[in-house]
């Protein structure tokens, strides 16, 4: 339906701006009367096509995105008048260079620090992008236009944030997979004015039914963090909830992370306010990335989290390296169990992921009940599975730890 809707807007002469990243201020596109839309990047379907040109070692998100573009299998990319890139990871930067050979691409230069210098640089970049939009779309963005776009975007964010916050209830009212599907789906509603009202109605219905006693049974409450979640990587959320857990929050940039902060509409310098809001996003390309740690800490407390699952896409070196800090923070400061899942967009590892998540959730359930009955046969299976899968000794021990709760250094 979203494909048909965007075509209808194009037929009416409404421009489309495609994007791949949460750092792009969508208010700029909305201010010129364009539709900002996330481009296809979550399917294994186009990875093989991309690998004809890109290294196989690149992350699946980049390969999927590029594959959709060169195969013309993403209607949103097809109808996009302009694609907005950003200097986040190295893979994306090179992808944008290649895309520019067959599609208009504008790349925003993102600083890798959230310092005062970084903020001032980003503010100038937001204004440079605004000026480029004015030239490209032949529209002058007035103060009234940008303020209107900011207010509407804030209302959409507010409504989606409040939808996510129903998962603070214990027991959880619904499955987190359903909440995430609604969040993802909201990004493909292009009648922006009606979105807040529709989302609010869903939130109110969930709360009303909750107070009538309609909710899930008590389950281990899981926070998911790491690389972007959607499409084929929804297997992580599904694996958690199929094995007795419930995803109460998705911190990834397709979840709470992009909804947590609003643009300060009271600021006289509205472009400075836009820059501050977007630069505050905690992504592993930032150094240091204190904002992500701070947000994870708040989510753990506010959503009554029992355990943290981090999804790391193969080839995403920044998230992989930062997982060291996330594990340490969760284990040592929050005293909660943590597990990292390295994966890609294929379905080949779904069984293995399910096994690991089942053990992780079982461990949490045992801890919550005050019992710790370990199945040594299951430990043996984890070891044999690791050996047959070609894992190194430390990885195998890590899998056993994820189940037993005993740190590797003690095994």
Feature-to-residue mapping (PLM):
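Glycine/threonine-rich flexible loop motifs
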Residues: 94, 316-322
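Acidic/His-rich segments in extracytoplasmic proteins that coordinate ligands and/or metal ions
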Residues: 66-135
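An N-terminal, globular interaction/scaffold subdomain
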Residues: 16-70, 95-96
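Acidic beta-strand-to-loop metal/phosphate-binding motif
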Residues: 79-87, 306-314, 385
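A charged, amphipathic alpha-helical module
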Residues: 1-15, 127, 131-247, 251-259, ...
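Redox- and metal-dependent alpha/beta enzyme cores, enriched for Fe-S-associated oxidoreductases
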Residues: 11, 23, 28-42, 49-50, ...
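A short, acidic, amphipathic alpha-helical segment used as a generic capping/interface helix at domain edges
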Residues: 69, 287-304, 322-325
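Peripheral docking tails and interdomain loops at the edges
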Residues: 324-379, 383, 392, 403
